[in-house]
């Protein structure tokens, strides 16, 4: 078998689910990966699923790796060299791979795993054989199993042996879209952006809502919300994301005329909640996510959050409440 380059993707929490739920989440993860790569003009030539791993062949592995680090559900992604299961093929593959991977290293370690228990050599013995082969090719190196400069990983699976050394970390969590929709209240600040990102990581699709306060906010604030939305879009596999912009300047002006300044902030927030709930009903969202942090401002005291929550019939999700 000829050796070939392939992307190895690992995922974590998904594997803890029941077989039915896991299968559904894996399908969504694969669909999201294809969408993200396609949006960035990278063709997916083939995908193989095996034992908590995805093996992906693309038209541009180097750029694909960068994109995969922004796909929810991905724990890590690596460019791997695939060989056959013949020991000589694996040894030759590791020697070939090591010449580039260990070029600046003084010490190294081989980490072998054998999910394919039909393979006749144990993981420990295989690591020793491969380590000896590397030392013969590169005698200036030394083995250090505790604190090596570089590690080379070898996974023995039914479809072949996979050799890699770099793991690009992904966001983990669940695939985007497996938990339904939520309305995300976006202010342009860091709290609302992080809250939206965290709920996306748990598998929710977001429907961003921005309240345009007109002349009450600066042009810089409006530019900031655009930057935040652009950043969030990088993590969303959909081609288009509809942002609901609600003009609220006139309503705020009315509140200034009839509501005592002491209570104006909480009334304004209540209005935002009620509008968000109507949007949620319209789009079929099951909750509202906000960037509220307990005690940060007057409208975010426990008493006021309690009052606001009683106005709404659907769940209010506050991922950053304790930060």
What name fits each language-model region?
Residues 189:
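Conserved G/P- and acidic residue-centered "switch" motifs that form tight phosphate/ATP-binding loops
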Residues 152, 207-209, 244-246, 289, ...:
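Hydrophobic/aromatic beta-strand patches that form the interior of the parallel beta-sheet core
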Residues 1-183, 193-241, 310:
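RNA-binding accessory domains that recognize and position tRNA/RNA substrates
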């Amino acid at each position: 078998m000829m050796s070939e380059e392939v992307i190895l993707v690992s995922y974590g929490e998904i594997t803890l689910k029941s077989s039915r739920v896991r299968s559904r989440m894996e399908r969504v993860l694969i669909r999201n990966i294809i969408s993200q790569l396609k949006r960035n003009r990278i063709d997916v030539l083939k995908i193989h699923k095996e034992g908590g791993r995805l093996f992906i062949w693309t038209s541009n592995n180097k750029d694909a790796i960068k994109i995969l680090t922004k796909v929810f559900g991905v724990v890590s992604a690596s460019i791997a060299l695939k060989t056959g299961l013949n020991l000589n093929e694996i040894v030759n593959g590791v020697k070939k791979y090591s010449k580039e991977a260990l070029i600046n290293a003084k010490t190294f370690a081989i980490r072998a795993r054998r999910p394919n228990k039909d393979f006749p050599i144990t993981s420990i013995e295989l690591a020793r054989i491969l380590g000896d082969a590397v030392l013969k090719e590169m005698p200036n190196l030394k083995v250090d199993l505790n604190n090596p400069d570089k590690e080379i990983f070898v996974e023995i699976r039914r479809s072949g042996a996979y050799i890699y050394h770099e793991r690009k970390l992904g966001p983990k969590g669940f695939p985007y879209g497996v938990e339904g929709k939520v309305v995300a209240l976006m202010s342009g600040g860091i709290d609302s952006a992080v809250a939206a990102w965290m709920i996306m990581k748990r598998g929710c699709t977001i429907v961003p809502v921005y309240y345009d306060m007109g002349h009450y906010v600066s042009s810089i604030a409006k530019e900031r919300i655009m930057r935040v939305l652009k950043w969030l879009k990088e993590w969303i596999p959909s081609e288009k994301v509809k942002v609901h912009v609600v003009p609220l300047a006139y309503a705020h002006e009315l509140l200034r005329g009839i509501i005592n300044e002491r209570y104006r902030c909480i009334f304004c927030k209540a209005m935002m909640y009620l509008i968000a709930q109507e949007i949620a009903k319209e789009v079929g969202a099951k909750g509202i996510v906000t960037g509220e942090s307990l005690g940060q401002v007057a409208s975010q005291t426990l008493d006021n959050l309690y009052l606001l929550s009683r106005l709404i019939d659907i769940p209010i999700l506050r991922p950053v409440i304790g930060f």
